[in-house]
Amino acid sequence: MCTPNDLAVLHAIFNPNVPFGNFDEQNVGDTEANADLDGRFSSAILQQAQDLERDGVKAAESEDMATAILKFSEAIALLPERASAYNNRAQALRLQGDVKGALEDLNQAVELSGIAGVAGRQALVQRGLILRLQGKDDEARKDFQRAAQLGSDFAKQQLILLNPYAALCNTMLRDMMQKLREPNGHKIQVGASTSLEDDREA
């Protein structure tokens, strides 16, 4: 499973103006959904796969992407029907500039997750971000909508940014606030004399 830290890395790359470390959330429902999905696997093999993923995340945090990808690939080979390692490898591939490979892994993660739990939500968010970077806003919007339905606040923020009407309203509001601050092109001076009494005393 992606840690908040390695998700924040991707978040910072795509969204440098958004506060760092607020990429995605996990709740009790997510934990239960993940437990249900992981219950299909042998506990011993599952533990090995999770250990490999942790090693991969540590390597990625040390900027050793080659080792990270190797560890995630080993986890996938061990449990090819588990979505989490595809998610993690997709992020490492994206950080290496392999967008095609990242999208292939994310497509697989979405399918394997059944569009549920943390793995499904994170795959949709990551894929949506890549699609948005590629200018495929309609496809990105669909992924963000599904991720939002799974409880991702970050996906909800992306949907607002992709809404042309919201963008227009934001522009109009900004212009209106600017006019209120500077009526007739003149800035309002705080503490400026405005009363007749003040004028007479001047």
Curated annotation (Swiss-Prot):
Cross-referenced SUPFAM superfamilies: TPR-like
Recorded hits in InterPro entries, A to Z, give: TPR-like_helical_dom_sf, TPR_2, TPR_rpt, TTC36
PROSITE patterns associated with the record: TPR_REGION
Q: Which domain of life is it from?
A: Eukaryota
The record ties this protein, via Gene3D superfamilies, to: Tetratricopeptide repeat domain
Q: Which SMART domains match?
A: TPR
Query: What are the protein's UniProt keywords?
Result: Repeat, TPR repeat
Q: Repeats (TPR): which ranges?
A: 49-82, 83-116, 121-154
Which family would the database say this protein is a member of? Belongs to the TTC36 family.
| Listed name of the protein | Tetratricopeptide repeat protein 36
**Which organism is the protein's source?**
Xenopus tropicalis
